[in-house]
Amino acid sequence: MSDNHTEHSVLPAVTKVIPEQPASPATYLDSELNCPELKQRLETFQSWLADAFNGGISAETLIAARSDYIDRLLGRLWTFYGFDDVPETALVAVGGYGRGELHPLSDIDVLILSKQRLNDEHAQRVGQLITLLWDLKLEVGHSVRTLEECLLEGLADLTVATNMVESRLICGDVALFLQMQKHIFSDNFWPSPKFFHAKVVEQQERHKRYHGTSYNLEPDIKSSPGGLRDIHTLQWVARRHFGATSLSEMVDFGFLTKAERNELIESQSFLWRIRFALHLVLTRYDNRLLFDRQLSVAQLLQYQGEGNEPVERMMKDFYRMTRRVSELNNMLLQLFDEAILALDTNEKPRPLDDEFQLRGDLIDLRDENLFVDKPEAIMRMFYLMVRNQDIKGIYSTTVRRLRHARRHLKQPLCNIPEARKLFMAILRHPGAVSRALLPMHRHSVLWAYMPQWGSIVGQMQFDLFHAYTVDEHTIRVLLKLESFADESTRPRHPLCVELYPRLPQPELLLLAALFHDIAKGRGGDHSILGAHDVLEFAEQHGLNSREAQLVAWLVRCHLLMSVTAQRRDIQDPAVIQQFSAEVQSETRLRYLVSLTVADICATNENLWNSWKQSLLRELYFATEKQLRRGMQNSPDLRERVRHHRLQALALLRMDNIDEEALHHIWSRCRADYFLRHSPNQLAWHARHLLEHDSTKPLVLVSRQATRGGTEIFIWCPDRPSLFAAVVGELDRRNLSVHDAQIFTNRDGMAMDTFIVLEPDGSPLAQDRHPIIIHALQQAMTRQNYQHPRVRRLSPKLRHFSVPTETNFLPTHNERRTYLELIALDQPGLLARVGDIFADLGLSLHSARITTIGERVEDLFVLADKDRRALSIETRRELAQRLTDTLNPNDKL
């Protein structure tokens, strides 16, 4: 088995066609050293870089070529401006330019170094030189310092010190440059231990900005964890401590093995190639692989496939490579700290057993060949880590041995009986995820244990919904499940924290989470394929039939509760009965709701809000009640209507309301109105209607969050365009509608309820209530309905293709049609849908709005003008109108 798991992570081969390189700037005549001429020469050189790259020349070669070209250009200009005659002055490349790494849009950072402060004439020449470079559109960063100023600035600023560590002489006074180098590498200037620890802290802070993972779907090639900066950090540390100027020299000093050097070189080459391609696609410096750039970069790198396949293949390679860099970076920095900086430590290791020992709080091998001789010992190490809370991590040399052993595995670890016992023992232990599964994933042991895991490592989905790759998402699901055992999680997830301790076998839930997305990217239904995989895994690991079937059901149905809660009418008893029939037992319901909440939270940090929480709670308790009542006993709807009315009346009697007037209002309402509102809502509506001038429209906005959002109730004469007018106004006010209940009384008055949220998922801000009420009153009374103006899609959304789909869901209700609409999220969508309903004379009874990244998946409950389900002809016409209206086009 492979250690690196990147065998197919090699960029596509291309045929090398080497174009002729433009003339060196060293040959330019004085008469050619003017801005127009030099600009033309630079454009020619940049075009040559692109042609050479497209012709198959390596990024390494071209990066060095650009650095050399700029060296010669600056050297020629140095002479042209007379600096050869200025004593004790040097032109020094620093930063990435100092390393000789110049991508097409890279900054060119230079230091003009002098023994003494430059006089006015020489300073003026420097200004002329830099101005020319800026006029040439080169991104030049420069500093002019004396040697003393350099050292003082470097002592005060880590970034300046780092730039000086990788400085390189371009031209000028060699002795002065060497004098600076001597000071930089002395013990008085950032001693190696101090420099090392400062760079580690700097890296940790940088990683925090990217949430500690390179798996963000729009990563920064340079700065994300596992990116080029992590390789630079290793080089800086080795350069400062050993004086090593290359990865190969780091082998000579014993900092790297040859295999590790080769891995870093391969990783660096891969990242350079992607960064080089990105710079060719862009016109301004940036290192972020944003969605709108990914396809162009993938095509430039000759990734093949239909639609977004080139992007997904490129990004999978990228994520796998950054995983490798992250592991090497962490291991080597730890090794440097433990084995090099701490050479004089007298602390002796403490034996844990015959195979392992503890160095401080890190587990270490007692026999360096153990993992190769007994691969099951790898699992034994993680079992010790989950059992012994004194163990905080793995010692660096043991990580090195682990990586070596992975490379030499002859079979998956799960084929070894002892390893299987240990794996199941790990799952059954509290803290299994954070103390064992997470480090197993970081060190590719999960992949080495179960081959299925390898297919999802680095697997991305080109959308705005999934914030992480499939493997990273799965680990986050597992961590979220583990958090349900922690009482501190109760405020955010009260239901799950209440239920998790009541699960008879939490390890089965962890196993289901491990496999719930295991089949993503294979084609076919990943839930069904994953259920098949986990059944085989369960049988191999000795689970009995009941346990295996439960885990397989959880994997197969892991989306069921989320879909039912968010995209179905859960106030319809038939929906609850159908869902309950699938769940079958309260135990399975507890497992499923825990997995569902963890899955939503781990998909995207912005997805979980009080609205979703309220939907899942409502579905959970309705299902629990149905299961306890028995599947054959459906609720009596007439009794529910009667119960709601009586409870609402009891609340209103506390206010001494006019019951005759109340009867007059309620007598005009249909049964659905009482069925779909709680007694508190009914009382709230009635209280205000009784006091309201019936000649004017009424708008109510709840002060307390309702089902996680803000409830808006409207009462006014109904008209075909009312829904479109209201949702259009809410959209203009930057509010998202998540639920709508639409009722028309027997007297033609609309009594509609909308649940809305702010863009961040919170209820409507209190100070916005008066503005929204006034805006809706205006929209409700406006005689001439204004069709929503079609606004442009956001730049991010333009790069996603979501064909409009209309599905009419099966139902036994002869008076209603259930329409599921899937479309690209776009401004004014609900209002345009409402327009279509009005044009076709359709009545909307309820709407459930779900936005999933760049797509909406909405449910509408409709009837025709005779209050019956839509005919086949009307369905066909409705589907066509929706498709024609909502499919993205160039006008958006």
Curated annotation (Swiss-Prot):
It catalyses: [protein-PII]-L-tyrosine + UTP = [protein-PII]-uridylyl-L-tyrosine + diphosphate; [protein-PII]-uridylyl-L-tyrosine + H2O = [protein-PII]-L-tyrosine + UMP + H(+). InterPro entries: ACT-like_dom_sf, ACT_dom, HD/PDEase_dom, HD_domain, NT_sf, PII_UdlTrfase/GS_AdlTrfase, Polymerase_NTP_transf_dom, UTase/UR. PROSITE patterns: ACT, HD. GO terms for molecular function: [protein-PII] uridylyltransferase activity; phosphoric diester hydrolase activity. Residues 711-792, 818-892 form the ACT domain. Keywords: Hydrolase, Magnesium, Multifunctional enzyme, Nucleotidyltransferase, Repeat, Transferase. One of its GO terms (biological process) is regulation of nitrogen utilization. Residues 1-351 are annotated as: Uridylyltransferase. It comes from the Bacteria. Residues 470-592 form the HD domain. Its EC number is 2.7.7.59, 3.1.4.-. Has four distinct domains: an N-terminal nucleotidyltransferase (NT) domain responsible for UTase activity, a central HD domain that encodes UR activity, and two C-terminal ACT domains that seem to have a role in glutamine sensing. Belongs to the GlnD family. Modifies, by uridylylation and deuridylylation, the PII regulatory proteins (GlnB and homologs), in response to the nitrogen status of the cell that GlnD senses through the glutamine level. Under low glutamine levels, catalyzes the conversion of the PII proteins and UTP to PII-UMP and PPi, while under higher glutamine levels, GlnD hydrolyzes PII-UMP to PII and UMP (deuridylylation). Thus, controls uridylylation state and activity of the PII proteins, and plays an important role in the regulation of nitrogen assimilation and metabolism. PANTHER family: BIFUNCTIONAL URIDYLYLTRANSFERASE/URIDYLYL-REMOVING ENZYME (PTHR47320), BIFUNCTIONAL URIDYLYLTRANSFERASE_URIDYLYL-REMOVING ENZYME (PTHR47320:SF1). This is Bifunctional uridylyltransferase/uridylyl-removing enzyme.
